């Protein structure tokens, strides 16, 4: 099974070793064709607390680390 990876923006870094990453999905409306932007938020494990709010990061799926945390920060793409 392939490892799932996604790219998003850190919207919160207030928790210890955890960041909240927002990922935008753009798709056309099935009937009207207008581009609709849907945002999903994922909690991701950041072991060294390196990611800051506004950073663009790549996250990868991992085993469940807590009740809501199933992703980890793979790399920081751009700094805020």
Curated annotation (Swiss-Prot):
| Keyword rRNA-binding applies | yes
Q: What does this protein do?
A: One of the primary rRNA binding proteins, it binds specifically to the 5'-end of 16S ribosomal RNA.
Q: Which domain of life is it from?
A: Bacteria
- Tell me which InterPro entries the record gives: NA-bd_OB-fold, Ribosomal_uS17, Ribosomal_uS17_bact/chlr, Ribosomal_uS17_CS
**Gene3D superfamilies linked to this entry:** Nucleic acid-binding proteins
| Pfam families named in the record | Ribosomal_S17
One GO cellular component this record assigns the protein to is: cytosolic small ribosomal subunit
| Annotated transmembrane regions | none
> Which family does the record assign?
Belongs to the universal ribosomal protein uS17 family.
GO-annotated molecular function = rRNA binding; structural constituent of ribosome
Query: Which NCBIfam families does the record cross-reference, listed alphabetically?
Result: PRK05610.1, uS17_bact
Q: Subunit info?
A: Part of the 30S ribosomal subunit.
- List cystine links: none
One GO BP annotation of this record: translation
Keywords in alphabetical order, please: Ribonucleoprotein, Ribosomal protein, RNA-binding, rRNA-binding
Q: Which organism is it from?
A: Microcystis aeruginosa (strain NIES-843 / IAM M-2473)
Q: What is this protein called?
A: Small ribosomal subunit protein uS17
High-level lineage: Bacteria, Bacillati, Cyanobacteriota, Cyanophyceae, Oscillatoriophycideae
């Amino acid at each position: 099974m392939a490892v799932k990876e996604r790219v998003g923006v850190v919207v919160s870094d207030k928790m210890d070793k955890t960041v909240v990453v927002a990922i935008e999905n753009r798709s056309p409306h099935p009937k009207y064709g207008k581009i609709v932007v849907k945002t999903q938020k994922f909690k991701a494990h950041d072991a060294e607390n390196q990611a800051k709010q506004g950073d663009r990061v790549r996250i990868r799926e991992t085993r469940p680390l807590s009740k809501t945390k199933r992703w980890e920060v793979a790399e920081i793409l751009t700094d805020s």
